[in-house]
Amino acid sequence: MGMIGAFFDFDKTLLETESAKLGFQYLWERRLISFGFLLRILIANFFYQRHLLSDEFVGRIFLKFYRGKKLEEFTNGAPLFYRQYLKPRLAPNILCKVREHQKNGHVLILISGSVRYLLEPVIEDIGFDHLLCTDLEVGADGQLTGRANGPFCINKTKRTLASHLAQKHGIDLSRSYAYGNHQSDIPLLEMVGFPFAVEPTEPLRKVAFKRNWPILGFK
């Protein structure tokens, strides 16, 4: 009999808001981002929230910010950013679920389209066993290219990565749990025995009702 896993999405699931939004707010307050680029982000997010742009399209826009920069610029500040911006906005009810799974000895996996340097302080503080996420591409010159290194960890890619991890570590998906908020999380949610929709978008809410998936709130 395999181990039981618990897969948690991050943005608007374990975190009550979007980590990228907080990240760009942090950069804007420190004058590290131009008004023009911030405007592009706001416009893209406006259309994304209305389901008019895909996760990957918006993700590509976000990642262009990193082009020509050093990864160390961001990894060095990530722990402070987590403590000041992310940790105070963790969803109490979902964090409680994480603790329940920890208590029961389940394998904890944080799975998110967000970038690795933002999420590493999260898994270290909370105690996740594995992290599946989007990686930034580093060029031959040691600078970030503004692209992802591999696929974005979204949609069906989440399912693929989760499946590979489960096979590698002996996780029984039929006895495992998954938590997500967005219709793009459906491929992940439907692969486990116990899926949960967290403050779901309307498309995910409809699927959850149809399939009798429990719906959870942040608090």
Can you describe what each PLM-predicted range is?
Residues F57-N93:
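Metal-dependent phosphoesterase signature
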